[in-house]
Regions:
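An N-terminus-focused feature that recognizes amino-terminal "leader" regions
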Residues: 1-28
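Surface-exposed, interaction-prone regions used to assemble/regulate multi-protein complexes
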Residues: 120-127
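Extended intrinsically disordered, low-complexity coil regions enriched in Ser, Thr, Gly, Ala
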Residues: 34-58, 98-104
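Short, structured motif recognition centered on aromatic/hydrophobic residues
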Residues: 9, 31-33, 66, 133
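Hydrophobic, ordered structural segments
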Residues: 59-117
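Short glycine/threonine-rich beta-strand-turn micro-motifs
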Residues: 29-33, 86-89
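Single conserved hydrophobic/aromatic residue that forms the stacking wall/gate
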Residues: 137-144
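Generic beta-strand structural signal
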Residues: 24-26, 81-84, 128
């Protein structure tokens, strides 16, 4: 699996550290999570297709720690779920020469995410034209 794909999945729910504890669900070739921020102001779900993992549900308690552990690995990463008596206890990520073992959380310590009963009205409208897109693109930092 590409580490970049996993990092992209994580960044979409982690929101720069706003959401740390989530339940990941691996099923039918996809990885999904629903999330809620600690202050309950942000609620959402993220899904990644073409995920090569076994079917399981497991708790990721400290997403920042997980991303830091993944940062030491190369781009092509093998992913395994280690379990004891059928219960997932850790995630093992391995590239050619390095492996990391992330300990999973019990699902009872992961916040329950309620169903969204009604989508709120959106009150922000942003009009984009070629000038605003060009300006925004020019203000982005360049990679060195």
């Amino acid at each position: 699996m590409e580490k970049q794909s996993l990092n992209r999945f994580v960044s979409k729910y982690n929101l720069a550290g706003l959401v740390e504890s989530v339940k990941w669900e691996s099923k039918d070739g996809s990885l999904t999570t629903s999330f809620i921020s600690d202050d309950k102001s942000v609620l959402g779900s993220v899904s990644m297709k073409e995920f090569e993992g076994t079917s399981a549900e497991f708790g990721v308690y400290d997403t920042t720690k997980l991303t830091k552990m993944l940062s030491v690995l190369g781009n092509d990463v093998d992913f395994n779920i280690n379990d004891i008596d059928g219960k997932p206890v850790s995630l093992k990520f391995k590239d050619g020469s390095t492996s990391v073992n992330y300990m999973l959380a019990d699902l009872s310590v992961i916040p329950n995410v309620p169903d969204l009963k009604q989508l709120p009205d959106f009150n922000v409208e942003i009009k984009l034209d070629s000038n605003s897109v060009s300006y925004t693109h020019l203000t982005l930092p360049t990679k060195a």
